[in-house]
From Swiss-Prot:
Free-text tissue specificity from the UniProt record: Ubiquitously expressed, including bone marrow, brain, kidney, colon, skeletal muscle, thymus, testis and uterus.
Keyword Ribosomal protein: no
Reported function: Nuclear lamina-associated inner nuclear membrane protein that is involved in nuclear structure organization, maintenance of nuclear envelope (NE) integrity and NE reformation after mitosis. Plays a role as transmembrane adapter for the endosomal sorting complexes required for transport (ESCRT), and is thereby involved in ESCRT-mediated NE reformation. Promotes ESCRT-mediated NE closure by recruiting CHMP7 and downstream ESCRT-III proteins IST1/CHMP8 and CHMP2A to the reforming NE during anaphase.
Residues modified to Phosphoserine: S166, S175, S497, S499, S501
Compartments it resides in: Nucleus inner membrane; Nucleus envelope; Cytoplasm, Cytoskeleton, Spindle
Protein name (record): LEM domain-containing protein 2
Transmembrane residue ranges: 213-233, 377-397
Quaternary structure and partners: Interacts (via N-terminus) with LMNA isoform C (via C-terminus) (in vitro). Interacts (via LEM domain) with BANF1. Interacts (via C-terminus) with CHMP7. Interacts (via N-terminus) with tubulin; the interaction causes microtubule bundling and stabilization (in vitro).
Region (Required for nuclear retention and interaction with LMNA isoform C): 74-130
Winged-Helix (WH): region residues: 395-503
Organism: Homo sapiens (Human)
Gene name of the encoded protein: LEMD2
Basic and acidic residues composition-biased segments: 42-74
Membrane topology, from the record: Multi-pass membrane protein
Length: 503
């Protein structure tokens, strides 16, 4: 391939369907590699075509074998239904292909004792033969159906004439004749039918596995949904745990030390905290479940909570403040939050407490279920919206990439057209068909792009001009005064055949 001239190289490429450009020292190796690759592809296509032509002949042979296998039982069935005696049990004819001496020597003595018509008993019939004949089933019928084809392929014309003149004899069971001498023939003939029967089985198996997969996926989604509901509803025993913690809290008894007073103070404090906890939990639950009382917040003002406790327990403000002081000094979670004006700051004294809020709102089952369902649906919608946004962004990026590729391809096509126009103009100038050896850039643009497409192709044209200015050495950009105005033109530079030193 290295010895090919430029003309031969161009002809080889054109014969393989590739239109090369100008062949120079810089592009000759590229075109040689291109020719080598095109020859390899042509060789692969020829091999594929030969394989495609050989495949129909194999399919026709398989169909012919299947047709012969279907016709064989029709020819063998009348002989099998004959009411006469079994021919293969009697002495075979002298001209028969089965009359070979000693062929069935091991079964001929026993066969003579049970030869007879179909209406007679067969006392001498071997029990082993009866068991084998009963086990064979449909496989024996298939083997009998191919007997005429084997007989017609026997040696000699006399065997074929005997077969055509005599009734079709019943063949010996395959269990007595030994293993099948052609085990591959049955598998070959049964291959297309078995494959045809296996296709629906594969489809049903695939459908069954898909249904199981969908079932398990549905069960998994159901379990995930129930888990989200359980987490959002929260543990119902949380308020009871808070009440148990309050009942176990110690009581401040600094002023009085007698046992009776301490017991009374403890009971009064626990009762006050219990009522305060229930009140705050109910108010917070009402605010979360529709807010029927039009509350501004779940955090209840201190004065409102103090009035409620005074009405229910008849406790003084001093006991209420003592309860708040104990909550601030306790390290246990009693389910009550004390908040100040700035709810982000931690309250340390009773004077800074502005409102009280329950840590465990008391809501009904329906409210908890609806809130959990709303939260789950919201999260699912947010997930799908994010997924749709990402999918749309991916589609937009793919569209952008495709447009950039199309624009780049259009730019390369425009570069080829510009090179052809400038080169043709130079050739015409050499033949005295043009006045100047250069051509204006705008003139080339107007000749290549129609007016209705110039705005759309402006970006492609600008990229093509930049590409020629930076990557094409055969075209030089010059400035000439044409009709009294400076104009950018392109001049084709013909490669010189001699260097300056040789001149």
């Amino acid at each position: 391939m290295a010895g090919l001239s430029d003309l031969e190289l161009r002809r080889e490429l054109q014969a393989l369907g590739f239109q090369p450009g100008p062949i120079t020292d810089t592009t000759r190796d590229v075109y040689r590699n291109k020719l080598r690759r095109l020859r390899g592809e042509a060789r692969l296509r020829d091999e594929e075509r030969l394989r495609e032509e050989a495949r129909p002949r194999g399919e026709e042979r398989l169909r012919e074998e299947a047709r012969l296998r279907e016709d064989a039982p029709l020819r063998a069935r009348p002989a099998a239904a004959s009411p006469r005696a079994e021919p293969w049990l009697s002495q075979p004819a002298s001209g028969s292909a089965y009359a070979t001496p000693g062929a069935y020597g091991d079964i001929r003595p026993s066969a003579a004792s049970w030869v007879g018509s179909r209406g007679l008993a067969y006392p001498a019939r071997p029990a082993q033969l009866r068991r084998r004949a009963s086990v064979r089933g449909s496989s024996e019928e298939d083997e009998d159906a191919r007997t005429p084809d084997r007989a017609t392929q026997g040696p000699g014309l006399a065997a074929r004439r005997w077969w055509a003149a005599s009734p079709a004899p019943a063949r010996l069971p395959s269990s007595l004749l030994g293993p099948d001498p052609r085990p591959g023939l049955r598998a070959t003939r049964a291959g297309p039918a078995g494959a045809a029967r296996a296709r629906p089985e594969v489809g049903r198996r695939l459908e069954r596995w898909l249904s199981r997969l969908l079932l398990w996926a549905s069960l998994g989604l159901l379990l995930v949904f129930l888990g989200i509901l359980w987490v959002k509803m929260g543990k119902p025993s949380a308020p009871q745990e808070a009440e148990d913690n309050m009942k176990l809290l110690p009581v401040d008894c600094e002023r009085k030390t007698d046992e009776f007073c301490q017991a009374k103070q403890k009971a009064a404090l626990l009762e006050l905290l219990h009522e305060l906890y229930n009140f705050l939990a109910i108010q917070a639950g009402n605010f979360e479940c529709g807010n029927p009382e039009n509350l501004k917040s779940k955090c209840i003002p201190v004065m409102e909570a103090q009035e409620y406790i005074a009405n229910v327990t008849s406790s003084s403000s001093a006991k209420f403040e003592a309860a708040l002081t104990w909550i601030l000094s306790s390290n246990k979670d009693v389910g009550i939050w004390l908040k100040g004006e700035d709810q982000s700051e931690l309250v340390t004294t009773v004077d800074k407490v502005v409102c009280l809020e329950s840590a465990h709102p008391r809501m009904g089952v329906g409210c908890r279920l609806s809130r959990a369902l709303l939260t789950a649906v919201t999260n699912v919608l947010i997930f799908f919206w994010c997924l749709a946004f990402l999918w749309g962004l991916l589609i937009l990026l793919k569209y952008r990439w495709r447009k950039l590729e199309e624009e780049e391809q259009a730019m390369y096509e425009m570069v080829k057209k510009i090179i052809d126009v400038v080169q043709d103009h130079y050739v015409d100038w050499e033949q005295d068909m043009e006045r100047y050896p250069y051509v204006g850039i705008l003139h080339v643009r107007d000749s290549l792009i129609p007016p209705q497409s110039r705005r759309r192709m402006k970006r492609v044209w600008d990229r093509a001009v930049e590409f020629l200015a930076s990557n094409e050495s055969r075209i030089q950009t010059e400035s000439h005064r044409v009709a009294g105005e400076d104009m950018l033109v392109w001049r084709w530079t013909k490669p010189s055949s001699f260097s300056d030193s040789e001149r």
